[in-house]
Amino acid sequence: MGDKTKVQVSKLKPGRYIIIDGEPCRIVNITVSSPGKHGSAKARIEAVGIFDGKVRSIVKPTSAEVDVPIIDKRVGQVIAITPDTVQIMDMETYELYDVPIETGVEDEVKDQLKEGITVEYWETLGRIQIKKVRGE
């Protein structure tokens, strides 16, 4: 999909998503501090990357706007598994996607993958990650 939108920093909450350094991240913690009598409040946002798991943090004024990814949560079926990729087919559009196992599959899901099972995957900013295995 690759879509993103702008949201004011004061509207963000833990558990929501934000784009930091071009990487979609899940917000873990937000700390707001007012610097003094004439300064504007600043928010320190700590987040974990969806695809790489790295912790990132930014400091922004609460009145600033930041990019928020639009995450498309979809269901697909595993068609084929190679040593470094998983091929999935979307259950609604029947499009095929090649997902790299290293970055595109959650660690808990890697050992459960087999051909023919149904999975939930997230698509955002042109990247795909398999999040969980659905009941068969």
UniProtKB/Swiss-Prot annotation:
Assigned keywords, A-Z: Cytoplasm, Hypusine, Initiation factor, Protein biosynthesis
The species this protein was found in: Thermococcus gammatolerans (strain DSM 15229 / JCM 11827 / EJ3)
Taxonomic lineage is: Archaea, Methanobacteriati, Methanobacteriota, Thermococci, Thermococcales
Q: This protein is called what?
A: Translation initiation factor 5A
NCBIfam families registered for this protein in UniProt: eIF_5A, PRK03999.1
- Disulfide bond annotation, renumbered to this chain: none
- Among the Pfam families in the record, one is IF5A-like_N
Which GO terms are recorded in the biological process aspect for this UniProt protein?
A: positive regulation of translational elongation; positive regulation of translational termination
InterPro entries to which the protein is assigned, alphabetical: IF5A-like, IF5A-like_N, NA-bd_OB-fold, Rib_uL2_dom2, Trans_elong_IF5A_hypusine_site, Transl_elong_IF5A_arc, Transl_elong_IF5A_C, Translation_prot_SH3-like_sf
Where in the sequence is Hypusine found? K37
Is-annotated flag, keyword Magnesium? no
Q: Name one GO molecular function term.
A: ribosome binding
Keyword check for Cytoplasm, yes or no. yes
Q: Where in the cell is it found?
A: Cytoplasm
Q: Which family does it belong to?
A: Belongs to the eIF-5A family.
Q: Which HAMAP family match?
A: eIF_5A
Q: What does this protein do?
A: Functions by promoting the formation of the first peptide bond.
Name the GO cellular-component terms. Answer: cytoplasm
> The organism sits in which domain of life?
Archaea
